[in-house]
Design a protein with these regions (language model features):
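A conserved ligand/cofactor-binding region detector
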Residues: 1-107, 117, 122-136, 140
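N-terminal alpha-helical segment
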Residues: 111-114
Length: 140
């Protein structure tokens, strides 16, 4: 892991994302993917955050860490064309980042099947995935 780049992202993230829980989630996604706990990661910058993001700088820092990123704008509803979030998908290769994007599209559209591969891709422990599959997605 390139410590300089992750330190810079860690110092920068709270200047963009004001919600502390979201900062922690973003950093956990990035670090988890970097150290191999997760194969892929996904998170987003909301409208009030994305205007503060230098996406070229962010991409460069992720690349310095050995991560590839795919960005995508997703509308948040309503008639305002500026009401969108900037999603990002991470992986050790561009193909993995694109796979993450595809998996999340399937999940959001309801076109996916519960299976171990999605859980593994997202970095969940086998026991958690098995429990989820056993309960058929009901987490009560």
């Amino acid at each position: 892991m390139e410590k300089c780049a992750i330190s810079e992202i860690d110092a920068w993230m709270p200047t963009v994302v004001k919600d502390k829980a979201s900062v922690v989630r973003n950093m956990a996604e990035i670090v988890g993917t970097d150290i191999g706990v997760k194969t892929v990661a996904m998170d987003c910058f909301l409208p009030e955050e994305r205007e503060k993001v230098d996406f070229v700088w962010f991409r460069r820092k992720l690349h310095e860490m050995g991560l590839h990123v795919v960005f995508e704008r997703r509308a948040l509803g309503g008639s305002d064309p500026w009401n969108f979030a900037e999603y990002y998908y991470l992986g050790k290769t561009r193909d993995i980042a694109l796979t993450a994007q595809s998996v999340f599209h399937k999940i959001w559209s309801g076109e996916w099947e519960m299976n171990r591969e999605i859980g593994k891709l997202l970095g969940y422990p086998t026991t958690a995935v098995d429990y989820f599959l056993k309960k058929k997605g009901e987490m009560s």
